Regions:
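Alpha-helical transmembrane bundles and membrane-interface segments of multipass inner-membrane proteins
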Residues: 1-208
Length: 208
């Protein structure tokens, strides 16, 4: 587990630096890319634009660029991702699933950390990957997408492990008690996310 944690930290750092380098290169050649975008395929090109809304959500809601709100959102995003990593790790421990998904979670942490770094510098986000028909993105946006895809794929082995376990545990229970069991079971892992890992086994014991 410690080795995997170190790998995740290293991967997140490399991704952070890659996002910074890509943005730096695009920034240095901003005028050139604006005048003549670089085609990377039929649907993808490098075409830089500054996101003066701050984020996609702010643009959709018409909120605009509010610096302190964006910083708070990025901090909250980081905290949620750390919680999600611990929550998934606890489930992997309980069902003896592979923790390789946590490597993809490093993409999300790196994206949020880079977003926060950009906000604290007091500059607009520079988007430069234009996907035809979808919009303009940057590397951190791609990182977040990869993390979401990874979590969706992880749900497949999780569901295969969880379904027979639940079927055995709630056998013969009425519907209401099944719902109560489900809530209590979920609560175990919500608690585990806030506890040191060496206390997880004691928490899981009665649910084995």
């Amino acid at each position: 587990m410690k080795l995997l944690k170190n790998k995740c930290v290293i991967l997140a750092a490399v991704l952070f630096l890659a996002a910074g380098m890509a943005e730096g290169i695009v920034y240095m050649h901003y005028g050139e890319f604006q005048a003549q975008p670089v085609m990377l395929g039929r649907f993808l090109r490098i075409y830089p634009v500054y996101n003066d809304n701050g984020s996609w959500l702010h643009g959709r809601l018409g909120i605009g660029y509010i610096w302190w709100l964006l910083v708070c959102e990025d901090i909250l995003s980081l905290l949620v991702e750390v919680f999600l990593i611990r929550f998934i790790s606890a489930l992997c421990d309980f069902f003896s699933l592979s923790r390789k998904i946590l490597m993809l979670a490093a993409f999300g942490v790196s994206a949020s950390a880079y977003r926060l770094f950009t906000r604290l510098r007091g500059v607009y986000v520079l988007d430069y990957l234009h996907v035809r028909g979808y919009g303009v993105f940057d590397l951190p946006d791609i990182y977040l997408f990869l993390m979401m895809v990874g979590i969706i794929l992880w749900l497949l082995p999780y569901h295969r492990a969880y379904r027979p376990y639940k079927k055995e545990k709630v056998k013969g229970m009425p519907f209401f008690l099944k719902c109560v069991w489900e809530l209590k079971f979920s609560g175990v892992f919500l608690r585990a996310a806030f506890l040191p890992r060496d206390r997880w086994e004691g928490l899981f014991q009665e649910w084995r």
